[in-house]
């Protein structure tokens, strides 16, 4: 077969993927979702079913008051259409601090309620306060989640090794945000890259910096070599890639998943692996 270095590519033979993740289901999501849609980007919005519709004002010394009221249950399905809804715990409790029965209740009731509102199974979760332990991960898996996001910035574009320790690249207020965006779009190398930004919609009001996310989305949107996907779509794609089955000499690859996959086997050779099909791989040079 010649020399090979099989490397994952994203749909359409793209080498880059961009996703975002925003928490708490605050009313600022209405403006944020519109910005996402206007720029053709996608993300995951992590909601607390138990507080949807709750009215609240955040007050902190030396800071302006910020409306942190939550969106209404009735608008969830239409507001987040085209994006992804994820779980964030029923009441945004520190799940790792709770007894296991109550932690499971928070996870299950949140997921069940949000699934009724969206009409589809939830795949993604964001840890409240970024806090988790082995018990929380085990309960999330039992509830049917496929992955969960932390709040630990990596400043890198590496693909996740553990879907339940999904570390983002950075928060939108990170001083290196636009530098990272530039590195992501224009950096050299052939390995797949994931740029993953997170935050809370209310922070744009509190910091009076909506121009920050507008600048990022204007810069990131509209690139043909970038796959714009939700958190769940990316993890599902990576999971399907892990399921590939090789013949012993590498001349055939079977894709048992329901997802078309894309692969680079050398600098000159790329393959599309159709869902549920076995593909004969083209020869590569020695």
Can you name each region flagged by the protein language model?
Residues 1-28:
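Boundary/entry segment of secreted carbohydrate-active catalytic domains
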Residues 19-20, 84, 226:
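Hydrophobic "anchor" residues on beta-strands that sit immediately upstream
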Residues 26, 171-186:
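A Trp-anchored, charged/polar loop motif used as the substrate-binding/catalytic surface
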Residues 66-72, 107, 177-182, 210-216:
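Well-ordered, non-membrane alpha-helical segments in soluble/globular domains
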């Amino acid at each position: 077969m010649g020399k090979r270095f099989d490397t994952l590519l994203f749909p359409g033979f793209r080498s880059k993927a961009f996703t975002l993740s925003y928490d708490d289901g605050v009313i600022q999501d209405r403006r944020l979702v519109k910005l996402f849609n206007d720029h053709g980007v996608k993300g995951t919005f992590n909601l607390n079913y138990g507080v949807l519709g709750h009215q609240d004002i955040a007050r902190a010394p030396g800071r302006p008051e910020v409306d942190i009221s939550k969106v209404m249950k009735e608008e969830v399905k239409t507001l987040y259409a085209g994006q992804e809804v994820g779980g964030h715990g029923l009441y945004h409790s520190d799940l790792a601090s709770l007894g296991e029965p109550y932690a499971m209740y928070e996870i299950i009731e949140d997921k069940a309620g949000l699934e009724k509102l969206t009409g589809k199974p939830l795949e993604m979760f964001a840890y409240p306060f970024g806090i988790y332990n082995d018990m929380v991960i085990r309960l999330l898996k039992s509830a049917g989640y496929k992955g969960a996001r932390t709040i630990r910035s990596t400043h890198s574009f590496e693909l996740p090794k553990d879907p339940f320790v999904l570390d983002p690249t950075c928060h939108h207020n990170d001083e290196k945000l636009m530098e990272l965006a530039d590195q992501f779009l224009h950096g050299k190398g052939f390995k797949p890259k994931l740029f993953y930004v997170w935050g809370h919609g209310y922070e744009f009001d509190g910091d009076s910096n909506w121009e920050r996310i507008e600048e990022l989305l204007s810069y990131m949107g509209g690139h043909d070599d970038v796959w714009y996907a939700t958190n769940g779509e990316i993890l599902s794609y990576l999971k399907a890639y892990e399921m590939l089955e090789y013949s012993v000499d590498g001349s055939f690859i079977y894709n048992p998943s329901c997802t078309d996959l894309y692969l680079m086997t050398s600098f000159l050779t790329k393959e599309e692996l159709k869902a549920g099909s076995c593909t004969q791989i083209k020869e590569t040079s020695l």
